[in-house]
Amino acid sequence: MIFLLQNLKDLNFYNICKNHKEERNSMKRKRLTQIFPFLLPIRVWQRKLFYNIGMKFDKNTYSNKFGDLLKYEICNTKTSMINKNSGQDIIYQKNKVDNLKIASKTMNHILIYPGETFSFCYLIKNAKKYGKYKDWLILIDGKIVAKKGGGLCHLSNMLHYLFLMSPLTVIERHGHKIKSFPDPDKTAIQGIDSTISSGWLDLKVKNETNNIYQIDIYFDEEYMYGKILSNKESDVAYVISNENLRYVRQNNKIYEIVDIVRAEIDKNTNMQIKKEKLYSEKVEITYELSKDIKIEER
């Protein structure tokens, strides 16, 4: 009996130690700014500072010259600025539109010369001189919060799509990890989004050609429009599409997985020159899918 009691005591002590260790490990997994939120502005300032300093020494020449519109159009697209499927207050939607217009002024008509690199974050750091950002709802640590300057991913998404349809080489791009609401356009190409966060995540492309390229952005009441222009006409066009779109359930979470494919088309003959898979994208879906969508179990 004494031996049994001793074993039970040892087991209880072991469980207490184990639980304490798990709690400690859980605390270790938390970022310092999660434990002390008041440190977040300092951390953001530090990351932006170090990121900008790092760009001065990374051997890239960043585009910073603007000019009159170049003669030849390489590609174009448009995107609706208001997503009626998001369920978000229309005030925040209008705030996002204002933020997009401010951010676009930092890079509209930027020239990307041969050998230069375009950086989204490098350019938007000067946005304050064009106006004050407004609040937009974003996802931070699993919670939706209002943050000034939010919604700029709408612009980086459009630019990334344009870059994929051009001869420019994407050298940095980060997809969103979570999709919280369906696209307003059911025919929209999936997996081409590009999240940005100054100091952490950027969208960069390099001009490895001998031609000059330029970004042109403009707006109407409903849409944001984008074009890639050049000083020389191109004999080819690039078409982006999806293949192997599927939905899977893993660890009680639903993911969308899709291949992003690019076809190169000869403009003179309208014949396909080549077709290649650029990458595969996987994103967690947190909204309810339509009942007719098949979900694979894994």
Task: Label every model-predicted segment.
Residues M27-R298:
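Well-ordered beta-sheet/strand-loop patches within structured domains
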